[in-house]
């Protein structure tokens, strides 16, 4: 049994033949996730783990591990990790500093991505496979192990569309939130979605405590389709209806991620389209400068951004500019594509064309 993949309830079921106390099972679970045990032996020999349970774990349990291939540190404190999985493929995670107090970890949910958003490097890899629960959690375990501050949040904004790996990402989030696991608050765990409407509606029905961030980028369908091909499958009216349902059921503002692209979606007509699309829906808008290493898309100039923020006042909704850090190490939104994948080496920052996406 893979100790990094089991919920507390699943662990209880797996150990039931040994008749351990609930406290003993919880101790095993906490040793893996709360305390970051490095091996089965560390778990088996943990205090308050009965000998018969420890012996059973030594004989039947495993704790696979991602291999850290590379770490890159940026001047702004962001750290990008490149992992090699024993199941195949390479994935990336980012440690994000929040002032001098804590970290948030950005994790990947898939190797590659099927959605092919035009400004996203991961989409250029194509879809390889979904990550398993343990592969998602091991990103957090290993990044946390090297952290000098507490980890207080996890965002599923790395490689892949988390709602297309629905079961595994939700299982991982539940363990992240569990008080005997990582003990991260539900509202501090966010899934970013490009707009897979059936999964969004399922998520709302099931009532999960985690937040969704909706990548809209343009409320003009023709523009959105140019950069987000999912628009052709799940068009804006369908997505906006799902966002309305999300906001109303949860009684909170929906987070609208808006990738700001110079000369593309920064005009008055773009702000007016947002107003029409989200009329009567409680939202907050996150503006994220595009970071496209190919140079095809450029971030807005300060003048463009200032003018657009003025235009957005018609929304009468909160608007914030999200800092997308780690640009020089390929850690910014949209640049996670695995430095090396299948023998192909992605350009290093010094070699890359002008930067920019999310």
Curated annotation (Swiss-Prot):
Disulphide bridges: 106-333
Compartments it resides in: Cytoplasm
Cofactor: [4Fe-4S] cluster
Chief place of localization: cytoplasm
InterPro entries according to UniProt: Aldolase_TIM, Methyltransferase_A, rRNA_lsu_MTrfase_RlmN/Cfr, rSAM
Domain Radical SAM core: 99-327
Top EC class for this record: transferase
Family from the record: Belongs to the radical SAM superfamily. RlmN family.
Protein known as: Probable RNA methyltransferase MXAN_6459
